[in-house]
């Protein structure tokens, strides 16, 4: 599984966990749909969930004139996963993480979602 596909599947999994209230194992099984799992995919899902409180706190600090609960589910999920990747996956350059997150936001959402994701993640790396 390529990293882009792993990110897409991780977004789908995290979305299912939040919106459908599926258990982690059920959401993984649903997203993989019979495909073999991937270590990077698993790292994104489990890592995002393990660090979700810290990630959400950082997102709240960097959302200008927005509240986290007012974001769309897709945008919130992408921001959480990308923030995890920025903070905890040191082998991937920040610009790659941000570009991938923006593309995912455009793919799952729209152009405005991409702009929002780009702005918030840009603020996070400026802080770093």
UniProtKB/Swiss-Prot annotation:
Family under the similarity heading: Belongs to the NusB family.
GO cellular component: cytosol
Protein name, UniProt field: Transcription antitermination protein NusB
PANTHER family noted in UniProt: ANTITERMINATION NUSB DOMAIN-CONTAINING PROTEIN, N UTILIZATION SUBSTANCE PROTEIN B-RELATED
MF terms (GO), sorted A to Z: RNA binding
GO biological process: DNA-templated transcription termination; transcription antitermination
Alphabetized UniProt keyword annotations: RNA-binding, Transcription, Transcription antitermination, Transcription regulation
CDD domains for this protein: Terminator_NusB
Keyword DNA-binding: no
Span of the signal peptide: none
Function: Involved in transcription antitermination. Required for transcription of ribosomal RNA (rRNA) genes. Binds specifically to the boxA antiterminator sequence of the ribosomal RNA (rrn) operons.
One Pfam family from the record: NusB
InterPro entries the record matches: NusB-like_sf, NusB_fam, NusB_RsmB_TIM44
